[in-house]
Regions:
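Helical substrate-recognition/capping region of FAD-dependent monooxygenase/halogenase enzymes
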Residues: 75, 145-364
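Core Rossmann-like FAD-binding/catalytic domain of the broad FAD-dependent monooxygenase superfamily
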Residues: 1-205, 297
Length: 364
């Protein structure tokens, strides 16, 4: 791909079809040579833009100037579409690639990889930076637990167990999204001479394009891929209960172990996340007066005995939050992922098994 960053305040021309963030263009190879598509991205809603010129595999290096390339991409299936360009900031080429490290850690578990160092994906869906941030969030609290002395030997092992499968998931859906974007050209017979026509043929072609885009917009609406994945690792306490099935398009809140704890506003307008601590947090929903329940007391005593920092958040009268969370007791990690959930624990030994596994000391 050819990538061009530039500045332009020619909004009359650039916003001819309205304001946008990303706009994709289909190019006719009989008109545009090796170009098979293009896109423009609004970087700051003011004057900074990026144009991508999608080149066919094995194509020759373009000899067009940066300005000519911009005009050709913006013109799409028609002729060049000139705009006033104030500055060409940078022009470069890049090749989309998908790569995944075999391991996220060294053999002695003293070196860890995160972000682009261990995975690459294509931009479709916007998963790349989110993957890196989640890597850091996942690894950061585990490193802190080891340094602070309360993390067990299995804690750092769980980093790769949890994050590498998520990278595979994101890479898969990034490829799916990219295929849908470029698939329009084969799904709909495009004709540059009638796409803007005011007659029935033009209306029919535009309707077909509209229907394809609306039914293949998962790169913008894939909430299940972003929020609905589950961690499987040694520090996640297995549950006999069922969890919502994975749906790439939609996210169903759940506190089943391994999933991200659901966001919800409490009665006072605060977010439940604001109640969490920097280490493990036990959220318990209470019917009576505030204060740890018997289950909460078991967890508190176990945490004290094993020097595991634990915040207990007792919520009274939070029927809406409890309905969404679906359990009376939920153990949440510092990265807001659920370690365990249940309606009660029968003894301190039960709480001990849960807490020691969540901290990486044992795996039952």
């Amino acid at each position: 791909m050819v990538l061009i960053h530039f500045k332009s305040r020619d909004l009359t021309r650039l916003h001819r079809r309205g304001r946008f963030w990303h706009t994709f263009f289909l190019l006719d190879p009989t008109i545009s040579g090796d170009s098979v598509g293009g896109a423009i991205i609004a970087q700051d809603e003011v004057d900074t833009w990026t144009v991508h010129d999608f080149r066919a595999p094995g194509s020759k290096q373009s000899i067009s100037s940066a300005e000519e390339t911009i005009y050709r991409v913006l013109g799409a299936m028609g002729g060049p579409y000139p705009i006033t360009i104030d500055e060409i900031i940078q022009q470069s080429t890049w090749t989309p690639s998908i790569a995944l490290a075999k391991s996220y850690t060294g053999p002695l578990h003293r070196v860890f990889l995160a972000g682009d160092a261990c995975h690459q994906t294509i931009p479709s869906g916007g998963y790349g930076m989110n993957m890196g941030i989640a890597d850091a969030f996942n690894l950061g609290w585990k490193l802190a637990a080891m340094i602070q002395g309360w993390g067990g030997a299995r804690l750092l092992l769980s980093y790769e167990q949890e994050r590498r499968p998520v990278a595979e998931l994101m890479q898969h859906w990034g490829k799916v999204h990219a295929g849908k974007l470029v698939g329009l050209a084969s799904a709909v017979t495009l004709n540059a001479t009638i796409i803007d026509a005011s007659d029935a043929r033009g209306a029919e072609l535009r309707q077909k394009i509209h229907e394809y885009v609306q039914s293949n917009d998962a790169h913008n609406q894939c909430f299940g891929v972003e929020h609905g994945y589950q961690y499987h690792s040694d520090i996640t306490v297995k549950s006999a209960s069922s969890h919502p099935p994975f749906d790439p398009r939609s996210y169903t809140p759940t506190t089943h172990p391994g999933f991200r704890a659901p966001h919800v506003f409490l009665n006072d307008g605060s977010a439940i996340f604001d109640k969490f601590g920097k280490t493990l947090t036990l959220v318990e929903f209470m019917d009576g007066v505030p204060g740890p329940s018997s289950g909460g007391s078991f967890f508190r005593d176990t945490a004290d005995e094993h020097h595991i920092p634990l915040r207990i958040v007792s919520l009274v009268g939070e029927a809406n939050a409890q309905q969404i969370w679906g359990a009376r007791l939920v153990l949440v990690r510092p990265d807001h992922c659920v370690s365990w959930c249940g309606n009660d624990v029968g003894s301190k030994d039960d709480a001990k098994r849960v807490l020691l596994q969540a901290a990486g000391h044992v795996c039952w």
